[in-house]
From Swiss-Prot:
Record field: compositional bias (Basic and acidic residues): 208-221
This protein's UniProt keywords: Developmental protein, Differentiation, Membrane, Spermatogenesis, Transmembrane, Transmembrane helix
Protein name: Spermatogenesis-associated protein 9
The organism's taxonomic lineage, starting at the top: Eukaryota, Metazoa, Chordata, Craniata, Vertebrata
Compartments, record wording: Membrane
Gene Ontology BP terms: cell differentiation; spermatogenesis
Transmembrane helix in keyword set: yes
GO cellular component: membrane
Membrane disposition: Single-pass membrane protein
């Protein structure tokens, strides 16, 4: 429930009392009208009494003077505020009063039952002591159970976090394994598709380009060598022809 300041509560009380004081308002207004009519005579009498025998003003005259000075509209407005505040305070206090009355009724019924009950045996007294101990230990039990529930909640949260971290680590390892397998398969495919070339044993600077020739150059010393005889050359040609004939027969 919201805490209100004392001034607001007093204002509400005054405001709520206005509805119940309508008769009082009417009586006060009639009294003011009556004193306003008799006020000049009262003032003259008071002045003459002061000249002859100074006597203190009575409470009635003072009240008449005070009421004459009060404005009727402001008085009615204040009484209306009092009535409305009293109503609001009554609305606020009504649930509490009803709850307190119910508590008092339950307590009175319980006390009446305990008074009217006859003398009880020993085991009932022990049961009462046990119930009293349970009542005393109830806050400790509730605190312990709340601590246990909080620890269970913390363990569940920790397990969820650990599972999430393990899932992320497993995913990272799976990605690395897939990347490694892809690399191995790619290297294996390259190894079978493209033959490995051996590196040359000599450097590129040692390679010298030579002009292309369809026929080998005749060395000069061949001119000096003697030519074979004609019969030997004819014999070699015959041997070659016979070899070619045999190969043709075999192919057929």
């Amino acid at each position: 429930m919201e805490v209100r300041p004392i001034g607001w509560i007093c204002g509400q009380v005054v405001k709520n009392f206005s509805g119940r004081l309508e008769g009082l308002q009417k009586a006060i207004m009639d009294l003011i009208d009556e004193f306003k009519d008799d006020l000049p005579t009262i003032l003259r009498l008071s002045q003459s009494s002061q000249k002859t025998d100074p006597v203190q003003k009575t409470s009635k005259v003072r009240m008449a003077l005070a009421l004459a000075k009060i404005n009727r509209g402001t008085l009615i407005q204040g009484l209306n505020h009092i009535s409305s505040s009293s109503k609001s305070v009554a609305k606020l206090l009504q649930p509490r009063l009803a709850y307190r009355l119910l508590e008092l009724r339950s307590i009175s019924h319980r006390l009446l039952r305990e008074v009217n009950v006859a003398s009880q045996p020993l085991h009932s007294v022990q049961m009462k002591r046990g119930s009293l101990f349970e009542i005393i230990s109830f806050p400790a039990k509730t605190a312990l159970t709340s601590i246990m529930y909080a620890s269970y909640a913390a363990l569940i949260y920790l397990a969820v976090c650990v599972n999430a971290v393990l899932a992320k680590i497993k995913k990272i390892f799976q990605e690395e394994e897939s990347i490694r397998q892809n690399r191995e398969s790619e290297n294996f495919r390259k190894a079978f598709s493209e033959p490995a070339l051996r590196k040359p044993m000599f450097s590129e600077s040692e390679i010298k380009a030579k002009p292309y020739r369809s026929l080998p150059e005749k060395p000069d010393n061949l001119l000096d060598q003697p030519k074979p005889p004609a019969n030997k050359q004819s014999n070699k040609i015959q041997v070659l022809h016979s070899v070619f004939d045999q190969l043709a027969e075999l192919n057929e």
